[in-house]
């Protein structure tokens, strides 16, 4: 059987749209790209299972070899939406120009599966003693649905995991989490000529904002991680809107904020800190303050710096591991085994018009992955 080339796999991935979005008009599901991946890895000798997580949303688990432990190579099969007017190329066509691959998902991160595919072909598997797994998840760009489902229902426990997000081939051992909420204040509208007729939601929100800024200062004062460029959690007040007219008492005001917690700060603990910060305001204005999540919260993640897995991958890559501020599926997969984030391309290209991956990453990435397969499976 003639196996597809690296370029053919890459082209097939990029040409198969798999956008996930909280906007139903954009959301497509990933069934078609998972079907392609399943076929390719079956032809390569893997045992493949496709799991429907929700309607139109699928994970793929591929396994080569038997036994306990082994190495899991993971990534998400979905992409973000795109602004067609800002692209110079067809987002759903792999374009080669100026020693780059252009296309939606070239860096973030469908292209990673083409690198896995090619690396498998380079390895002598006659001495394999532990399994190699490949996981392709759904909805990383929205709810992390695929990673959450896999972690809860994992049919195996690998020794180690590498997630192929674009890190410029630098091993990432930790990142902050992400929590985004809306605080909605409900007042009572009325004519501005008589403030006693209503309850001004903006005035209540003023008290909420003061409490949130106190929480921000508390997070900076009490939590510190020297491994991060920004060593404390961050709290950002990102969006606020209230009222509809200068001559009307504001009946509703809404604030959107986010927190990026450090590894080790539990989501429950962060929620308790928020409730404590707002306790006095809520007691003063009972029933008028609601907190609504904008998305499922993502905890911080860290693979312990002295873990031998980090040293082994640093040796393969010939570079030291780092921490970053953006989020991946690592907090979930880390629940199963020591996990690192490591892949081709730059995070600066993610979610951008004319997303690309430089040809400079091709050979080094295949080399790194094939060495990892040998080290942890053979």
Swiss-Prot record:
InterPro entries referenced in this protein's UniProt entry, alphabetically: AcOrn-deacetyl, ArgE/DapE_CS, Bact_exopeptidase_dim_dom, Peptidase_M20, Peptidase_M20_dimer, Peptidase_M20A
UniProt pathway annotation: Amino-acid biosynthesis; L-arginine biosynthesis; L-ornithine from N(2)-acetyl-L-ornithine (linear): step 1/1
Keyword field: Amino-acid biosynthesis, Arginine biosynthesis, Cobalt, Cytoplasm, Hydrolase, Metal-binding, Zinc
Pfam short name (any one): Peptidase_M20
Domain of life where this protein originates: Bacteria
Keyword Hydrolase: yes
A single cellular component GO annotation: cytoplasm
One Gene Ontology term of the molecular function aspect: zinc ion binding
Catalytic activity: N(2)-acetyl-L-ornithine + H2O = L-ornithine + acetate
Binding positions (Zn(2+) 1): 76, 108, 165
One Gene Ontology biological process: L-arginine biosynthetic process
CDD domains in UniProt: M20_ArgE
Primary site of residence: cytoplasm
Cofactor binding summary note: Binds 2 Zn(2+) or Co(2+) ions per subunit.
Family of this protein: Belongs to the peptidase M20A family. ArgE subfamily.
Subunit structure: Homodimer.
Role noted for this protein: Catalyzes the hydrolysis of the amide bond of N(2)-acetylated L-amino acids. Cleaves the acetyl group from N-acetyl-L-ornithine to form L-ornithine, an intermediate in L-arginine biosynthesis pathway, and a branchpoint in the synthesis of polyamines.
Protein name per the record: Acetylornithine deacetylase
Native organism: Vibrio parahaemolyticus serotype O3:K6 (strain RIMD 2210633)
Organism phylogeny: Bacteria, Pseudomonadati, Pseudomonadota, Gammaproteobacteria, Vibrionales
Gene: argE
């Amino acid at each position: 059987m003639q196996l597809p080339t690296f370029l053919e796999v890459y082209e097939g991935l990029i040409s198969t749209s798999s956008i996930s979005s909280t906007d139903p008009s954009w959301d497509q599901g990933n069934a078609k790209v998972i079907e392609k991946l399943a076929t390719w890895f079956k032809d390569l000798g893997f045992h493949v299972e496709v799991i429907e997580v929700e309607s139109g949303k699928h994970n793929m688990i591929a396994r080569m070899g038997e036994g306990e432990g082994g190495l899991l190579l993971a990534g998400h099969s979905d992409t973000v939406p795109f602004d067609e007017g800002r692209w110079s190329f067809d987002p759903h066509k792999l374009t080669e120009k100026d020693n780059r691959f252009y296309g939606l998902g070239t860096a973030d991160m469908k292209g990673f599966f083409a690198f896995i595919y090619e690396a498998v072909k380079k390895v002598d598997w006659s001495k394999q003693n532990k399994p190699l797994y490949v996981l392709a998840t759904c909805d990383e760009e929205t709810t992390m649905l695929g990673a959450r489902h896999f972690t809860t229902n994992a049919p195996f426990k690998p020794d180690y995991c590498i997630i192929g997000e674009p890190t410029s081939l630098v091993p990432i051992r930790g990142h902050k989490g992400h929590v985004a909420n809306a605080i909605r204040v409900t007042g009572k509208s009325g004519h501005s000529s008589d403030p006693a007729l209503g309850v001004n939601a903006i005035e209540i929100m003023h008290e909420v904002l003061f409490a949130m800024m106190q929480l921000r200062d508390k997070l900076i004062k009490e939590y510190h991680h020297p491994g991060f460029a920004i060593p404390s959690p961050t709290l950002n007040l990102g969006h606020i809107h209230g009222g509809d007219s200068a001559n009307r008492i504001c009946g509703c005001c809404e604030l959107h904020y986010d927190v990026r917690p450090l590894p080790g700060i539990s989501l429950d603990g962060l929620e308790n800190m928020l409730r404590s910060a707002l306790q006095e305001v809520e007691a003063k204005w009972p029933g008028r303050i609601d907190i609504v999540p904008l998305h499922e919260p993502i905890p911080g993640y860290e693979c312990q710096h002295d873990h031998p897995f980090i040293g082994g991958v640093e040796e393969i890559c010939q570079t030291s591991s780092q921490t970053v501020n953006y989020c991946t599926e690592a907090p979930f997969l880390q629940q199963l085994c020591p996990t690192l984030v490591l892949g081709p391309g730059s995070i600066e290209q993610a979610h951008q018009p004319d997303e690309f991956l430089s040809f400079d990453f091709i050979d080094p990435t295949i080399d790194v992955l094939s060495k990892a397969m040998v080290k942890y499976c053979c």
